[in-house]
Amino acid sequence: MEIEGILREFGLVLAVGLVSVPIARLLHLPLMVVLVVAGVIAGQSVTGLLSIPLGGVDTELVFTLGVALILFHGGLGISLRVISKTAVGLLLLAVPGVMLTAAIVAVAVMPLFGVSFQIALLAGAVLAATDPAILIPLFDTLGLRAKVAQTVVAESAINDPMGAILSLTVAGVVTAGSLDGFGPATDFARSIVIGIVLGVVAGLALAVLLSSHWSGVLRDSPAATLLALVALVYFSAEAIGGSAYLAAFIAGVIVGNKELLRISHHDHHEQLFEGYVAQTTDIVVLAVFVILGVNLDLGLLLDNLVPGLITMAVFILIARPVTVGLCLIPDRRGRWTRRELVFISWCRETGVVPVAIAGALLSDQVPGAELVSTLVTFAVLVTLLLQATTAGWLAARLGLLDGATEPR
């Protein structure tokens, strides 16, 4: 009966998600906002159609292997040739930038919600990740200048695993209840190193096994090979203290840039593989946001409306511009203009990875997880409704569209 219940709930989640797609298109609203609202309506607080308690087998799979697949997909779209000219700025945004954003948000969250610095930092770390899944179709529609578009998308893809690592490290400190010397810093560094090594090994293995060379013995089974390898990498990383999310992302980068390693795939097999990854990612995105809506505490959201909106103002108007300025201005090779910096400061949407991390924290009953989930919900709604809808207008005003000249 338990298996039947899981299958029923998963089927209903997908049904709710699929119904939301045409509604979002009809209303010209961001899909993820509609998915959250649909989840709320389907949840116990409104219709009672869905009840998906966090911590079950189904939600654990979505928030672990599902997110690893999303990060693999993000890495798959990164072109090392394209981002080489802005590599310094990207690395600064991805590592110290994530930490700086988390720290600034934490300073605001502490007095507003009356929580400890550790819990406030946990909230900031989860919010620090952005979402390439939202930005890619948005920029394709706008025709944004390639340098800006590719940098913002690459930053979003790279800082997702970094935000996840920082979040899980801080969550460990919060759960332990104390800061044990350099332990968290050591764990953070070890997670990164192990994650990179595992990711490189897994990416090379996947690229070779699916190649057009004699070694491509699994080229006709890309879906099963991908799932098996991602699962193996995820649980291996968890077992030895590495970042499974970073490993999945790095593996995606390796496969996406296989031509630099002189590894070729047949066009047919490559299209099948990329199509499978994209479709699987779509399913996970639908599930994550509907599950968030189902488990959303509307009372908690309304009770924290004012401090939540103040936190979002600090997040958008202070933390992001300060981080972008400190990380990109020193990047001489990038030759960033003021208008480009303004656009990059404004354009950052909160999406699936922060939502999934918040869900994982709730599942593990980490102290402060409800606050984190509430703030992530605010961030999703505010950034998608405010920033995503005004990005085109701002890009046009700043002269950052292809063929446009910057206004004087």
For the regions a language model picked out, list residue spans one by one.
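Transmembrane helical cores of multi-pass secondary ion antiporters/exchangers
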Residues: 1-408
